[in-house]
């Protein structure tokens, strides 16, 4: 692996020892993530008052019932959208404090649409394989829900919000943390640290197990490789957001221990230990997901190394 232009152009603006700067980067990333989530939760109150007033004012009939119905159906939208606060914190830090370009987070125009498409396809294949193994082996089963137009539109509308949520986590752990550590050290170390923090941040989720944290870390390593090889944030934004969306709102899994409301399929868990079924954490807690991620890692690593060899040969010929 070699550092791309994105990492090479980063101004770290520090003479701190590597250990101190690494610990600072970990602290700041954690602070922005947890702080952003806290701000988002604190804004629920004022937000609900404003929306509640509008719903009551414009809705005929029982206003209270309308407010309750509104939040029952649409709170997930707000919950996912609140991640924009974390995104803005990192953007402010990069532009105002670091005085780096937003491209140092991976926001580059080159091939952005193609990378979004590839990220979506990767997650569809990964989750498709996991669901197929569940269904065929009896680990779990999927039945198509009978849905009216309203819940279908609700589900379809969630996709860009999952992209925002998953993309923000990628900006935090890959776009910012990985690149800043890599700028002062090396890529394997930066990938290991950012992926480990990614796993640790999920340890408070419902149904968490050792295997579920391991899978989150493996997914972080995979995202790190995809991020480095593309030198862009867009593929991992799409891969992460689609991964969560397909799990929760298409297949009916828990998403890292959290329910995702309406789904196209209804998932029924079969008998078996949590390490096989995933338990309350969802598919991310299953050994099946571990195997899929390991295979994905091998494929991406080999493709990435081949791409770098081709690039090096072209440079030599030039």
Identify the role of each PLM range.
Residues 68-85, 160-168, 273-294:
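Hydrophobic alpha-helical transmembrane segments
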